[in-house]
Amino acid sequence: MKLILREDVENLGKGGDLVDVKPGYGRNYLLPRGLAVSANPKNVKELEHQKAVAAAKAAKLKASAQAVAKRLSETPVTLKRKVGEQDKLYGSVTALDVAEALAARGVQLDRRSIVLDEPIKTLGEFEVPVKLHSEVAGKVKVTVEAEAE
């Protein structure tokens, strides 16, 4: 019996997969629970259409992420912080600080997409990785300078 899964089913497949199951399993478990629909020509055609729409949407998201990555590489960020002895910062520079500085330059990013293993605590230039999409990552150049007293 051929069915199209509506949701992920453990040990069988993911939502949208066309699967071949034993008739009893399909009739008595998958269909009554709404986990699958029969694979008639109409449903198969609708599935193909949904997959095409999803693929187009994914391609559009990836393209916009690549555009943001390009823009990030062209947008250096300079942050001024108070420093103590031996150029140690009072406090630190966090992902939120970088996100706010980028927002001031017109690049809106969620702070969780900025990958800082640990906050920046010294002066200097840093390449900070940014996770924009599952397949696209960018880098932003962050310069931490001493604030004029």
Curated annotation (Swiss-Prot):
Keywords: Ribonucleoprotein, Ribosomal protein, RNA-binding, rRNA-binding. One of its GO terms (cellular component) is ribonucleoprotein complex. GO terms for molecular function: rRNA binding; structural constituent of ribosome. The keyword Manganese does not apply. The keyword Ribonucleoprotein applies. Pfam families: Ribosomal_L9_C, Ribosomal_L9_N. One of its GO terms (biological process) is translation. Gene3D superfamilies: Ribosomal protein L9, C-terminal domain, Ribosomal protein L9, N-terminal domain. Binds to the 23S rRNA. Belongs to the bacterial ribosomal protein bL9 family. NCBIfam families: L9 (TIGR00158). This is Large ribosomal subunit protein bL9. It comes from Anaeromyxobacter dehalogenans (strain 2CP-C). The lineage of its organism: Bacteria, Pseudomonadati, Myxococcota, Myxococcia, Myxococcales. The gene is rplI.
